[in-house]
A protein has these predicted regions:
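Multi-pass alpha-helical transporter architecture, strongest
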Residues: 76, 165-191
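A late C-terminal transmembrane helix in Major Facilitator Superfamily
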Residues: 113-151
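Helix-to-loop junctions at the C-terminal end of transmembrane segments
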Residues: 43-56, 145
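C-terminal transmembrane helical hairpin of 12-TM major facilitator-type secondary transporters
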Residues: 57-107
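Transmembrane alpha-helical cores of Major Facilitator Superfamily
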Residues: 33-34, 38, 66, 124-132
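Short extramembrane helix-to-coil loop segments that connect adjacent transmembrane helices in Major
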Residues: 17-27, 115, 151-152, 161
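Extracytoplasmic gate region of multi-pass secondary transporters
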Residues: 1-47, 101, 137-138
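A membrane-interface helix-boundary motif in multi-pass transporters
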Residues: 142-176
Length: 191
């Protein structure tokens, strides 16, 4: 599920920032490009440090998913009123997006009955599902944006596009609820 919302956000974020917040296209692109690698690194480091310090996996995985949901909500609900609030939403999402990775790459190695071959297959399966969702999400998101644009009649084309991007991203954010529920149900593999 992670790649589903993340891939859609990465695709639309520069346009959404430029149109909803009135940013220059180059500044919006730079912010979007820098946010996920730079802040995502901090989230990954935090996830790894917390995992090492606590020996737990599940709470960190769940916290990452909750942060991603919170980040999407803050971004979509506040960007048009406040660019700093929108940027805060991006940062919250990016931290959560990075936080889950150390956990998900550790858990398969700790599960009962796993050996080198099975761990490799688990990583391949997780990556394949992620890339598939990353391919599908912009296609579905574009269609959803077009549908949402039609729900905001009487506005300029730009405002309709902002409306469509905002609410399609808002809805995509709820995939993080499914990921959070899965994180809460998964068996703790840490000590």
């Amino acid at each position: 599920m992670d790649f589903f919302c993340y891939s859609y956000m990465v695709v639309i974020l520069p346009t959404y920032l430029a149109k909803a917040a009135g940013m220059a296209a180059s500044a919006a692109g730079l912010l979007a490009a820098a946010a996920f690698p730079a802040i995502g690194i901090l989230g990954s480091m935090a996830g790894g440090i917390l995992m090492s310090a606590t020996g737990k996996r599940k709470p960190i995985l769940a916290a990452g998913q909750a942060l991603k949901l919170a980040g999407v909500l803050v971004l979509t609900l506040f960007l048009e009123q406040s660019l700093p609030a929108g940027i805060a939403g991006i940062i919250i999402f990016a931290v959560g997006n990075g936080m889950w990775m150390p956990v998900m790459y550790t858990m398969p190695m700790e599960m009962d009955g796993m050996d080198d071959n099975r761990v490799g297959a688990a990583f391949a399966f997780m990556s394949s599902c992620g890339f598939l969702m990353g391919f599908i999400s912009p296609i579905l998101g574009g269609g959803l944006t077009n549908i949402m644009m039609g729900m905001d009649p009487g506005q300029t084309t730009v405002l309709c596009h902002v409306f469509g991007l905002k609410w399609s991203l808002f809805l995509f954010g709820f995939t993080n609820i499914a990921a959070l529920l899965c994180a809460l149900r998964i068996e703790e593999t840490g000590k």
